[in-house]
Amino acid sequence: ALGPVSALGATHPLTLNVPDIWRDTPNQYGPLFLGVQKAVYALTGDHVIAGTALHRVVAVLGILMLGWSVPRLAERCGVSDVAALWLGVANPLVLFHLVSGIHSEALMMGLLGVGLVFVFRALDDMGPETPRPPARVLALFVAGAVLVTCSALVKIPTVVALGFVGMA
């Protein structure tokens, strides 16, 4: 993984906008988020404002996925879905930090949340109370596992969740 100076050069306009402390730091993002960054750059070029705006759109998509998944996960765990939504998604700290700071964690957590919802639905569909066709159960489980894997491809810490999916 390369840092801004080694990847772009010390005089590149984007490198000049990186604080000195981070200029030689290697990139810690996974291949999926690097692909997102590459697509943003392909669309916006050296236009910092447009690139920042597009990265924020990606962060908002992650927050929207999180907003869809958190109440469902909370309900499954016997926690108030409204409280979970306010504390986990809609509070100013989450919105300010993840969207304003254009952090990859918004996309990472959104993919993780939706993936876990799909995996849990597959497990619920296997139960005797609500038997579903095996193809549906398998499709939900595989889709969930793929989304959790994509989350880990944004940033590696969520690979731990894939272990729990495998144990499910």
Can you say where each PLM-predicted feature lies in the sequence?
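Transmembrane-helix signature of polytopic, membrane-embedded enzymes
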Residues: V70-P92, L123-T130
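Transmembrane-helix motifs of polytopic, lipid-linked glycan transferases
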Residues: A53-C77, M109-G110, V114
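Membrane-water interface at transmembrane helix exits
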Residues: Q37, Y41, G45, P71-E75, ...
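Membrane-interface transmembrane helices that cradle and orient dolichyl/undecaprenyl
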Residues: G78, E105, L112-L140
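Membrane-interface starts of transmembrane alpha-helices
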Residues: D46-V58, S80, A84, R136, ...
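Intramembrane catalytic core of multi-pass membrane enzymes that act on lipidic substrates
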Residues: A1-V57
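Membrane-interface alpha helices of multi-pass inner-membrane proteins
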Residues: L95-H97, F118, P134-G166
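Multi-pass, polyprenyl lipid-linked donor-dependent membrane glycosyltransferases
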Residues: V57-L61, L85-V119, L123
